[in-house]
Every structure is written in C-alpha cells, then in structure tokens.
Amino acid sequence: MSKILVFGHQNPDTDAIASSYAFDYLSQKAFGLDTEVVALGTPNEETAFALDYFGVEAPRVVESAKAQGSEQVILTDHNEFQQSIADIREVEVYGVVDHHRVANFETANPLYMRVEPVGSASSIVYRMFKENGIEVPKAIAGMLLSGLISDTLLLKSPTTHVSDHLVAEELAELAEVNLEDYGMALLKAGTNLASKSEVELIGIDAKTFELNGNAVRVAQVNTVDIAEVLERQEAIEAAIKDAMAAEGYSDFVLMITDIVNSNSEILAIGANMDKVEAAFNFTLDNNHAFLAGAVSRKKQVVPQLTESFGA
C-alpha cells in the first residue's frame, strides 16, 4: 500500500506547511495511517524562520502524487482543485482539513472532511490533537502557532475566531515562546521583500479563483512600508502581465498589506477592472487604490470579488 501524501496548497504559506506537518504526525499517531508530509513549493522566508526556530526540516517538494507512487492524498489549508497538486483529479482525496470556502471540489468516494470558519487550518489540527488525546510535541506546537500567527497577523485579522485566542495561548505555552515577541519576529521575517525579484514577489502567496468563468489570481505580500513596494510598480506590473499571458489569468489582484497599520494597497490589472472597483467601492488610479483596514484575502477580498463577478 502506497503512502498517503499530506500537503497544503501551491505557493505554500506558513499555515499550509504547519498544518500539513502536524496533521501528518497526528494521522500516524491517532489514526494509524501510513502518511508522508510533502509540499507543493519551497517555504517562504517567514515559514523558513519558523522551521529554523523550532528545528523542523522542510518537507520535500513534489509536483505529482502518482509520480511518488501515491494514489491517495490529504489536503490541508485548501480544497479547491486549482490550488492543489497537479494530478489531483487522478488520485483519491482521502481527507481535507481546511478553513476556506469550499469550491471547485468534488470526489468520487466518501472522505473525511473538516472545514471550520476559524483563523487557520493549524487551529483545527491543534483541536484534533486534543480531541484524540495526543500530546503535542514542542516543535509541532511551535509550527501550529506559527501557522495561526501568520494567517491572522498575530490575531489582528478579521478572520480571527474567538477560539483562536485560547489556541494561541495554549500553543505558545507548549512551544515555550512569548506570543507577542515570537509573533512579531515571525511576521517581520516575512516582510523582507528587497531580495525578491518581481516574479518571486507576486508568487510568494498567490491563489487562483474561478469566478464566473474567469481565472482570477489574487496574491498578497506583507510589508512594513507600502510605498517601498510601489516604487517597483512598473516592474511588478510587467511580471504580472507575463504571468497572465503564460497562465491565462483574466485578472490579477495584488494585495500589498501593511502589517503594522493593518491596511492594504490593491494593485490590479486585467479584463474586469470595473468589477474589481465595484467590489471594493473604490476607483483605481494608475492601477492601484488604498483599501483601509483590509488585511485578509479570505474575508476582505475574495468574497467581495466573488459577489462582484457574479460567481
């Protein structure tokens, strides 16, 4: 029997890596499954900081499940097929642990599926450890905490669920870190954009959404200085246009998020800019506009785009 591969989404963020890493451990300890955690991309700088801090080896990167001899997969931090492994339609989805909308998803067989409207997939996995009476090792607690901090911007994002505060406190204690100090260090590690090329910058954290027949790419970068990112606008737009031509995106929306002041600048290019403007009730000026208080793609950008596109 081949191993069941456990992985997060393409262009993995910290929650994708952390939740899959922890769920792989839980699957073996609690459910007796023969699993292996892998990743659909290399860790970003924020995730690398967490991995190094807690002494965890990055999962190996794969592009195809069947190429690894696997016929079954478990998805964490995503469910939409266009965000998953290349041959997702050719293998059996054994299970899903996620905190996003469910869309573009169907299976031939019954599966284990747990989806909750909480701040991170890591939050769900942590509760599953408790429900099954499995002790959480320090390194796993640290990674789960990192996933939660990353996705909720240290519990400041509107996606933060009331239960996430207690989860963060408990994980910080298990990981033996100060929540605020470690959280800020983690987030700042992910804001070093100067060393990134424009192609890398628009792919750090990007997902594709099918909206009423349109392939809309929504990317996000975290920074402490929006103006510094906009200084590279011309080169960023060139990279976006190349990506649109190569991948067939109808529209590309880039969130440039200020993690200190909790605001974003939206840079958008594509065929449906009227729908983008209507979604956020703003007018793009030189392809960008300010979106006050917006820090969450999942709650403050994608639902609005979905409604505006009529998806």
Swiss-Prot record:
Top EC category: hydrolase
SMART domains: DHHA2
Reaction(s) catalysed by this chain's protein: diphosphate + H2O = 2 phosphate + H(+)
GO molecular function: inorganic diphosphate phosphatase activity; manganese ion binding
Enzyme Commission number(s) of this protein: 3.6.1.1
Entry binding sites for Mn(2+) 2: D15, D77, H99, D151
GO cellular component, one term: cytoplasm
Gene assigned in the entry: ppaC
Lineage: Bacteria, Bacillati, Bacillota, Bacilli, Lactobacillales
Name of the protein in its database record: Probable manganese-dependent inorganic pyrophosphatase
Cofactor: Mn(2+)
UniProt-listed Pfam families: DHH (PF01368), DHHA2 (PF02833)
Cofactor note text: Binds 2 manganese ions per subunit.
Organism: Streptococcus pyogenes serotype M1
Cellular compartment(s): Cytoplasm
NCBIfam families: PRK05427.1
Lineage: superkingdom: Bacteria
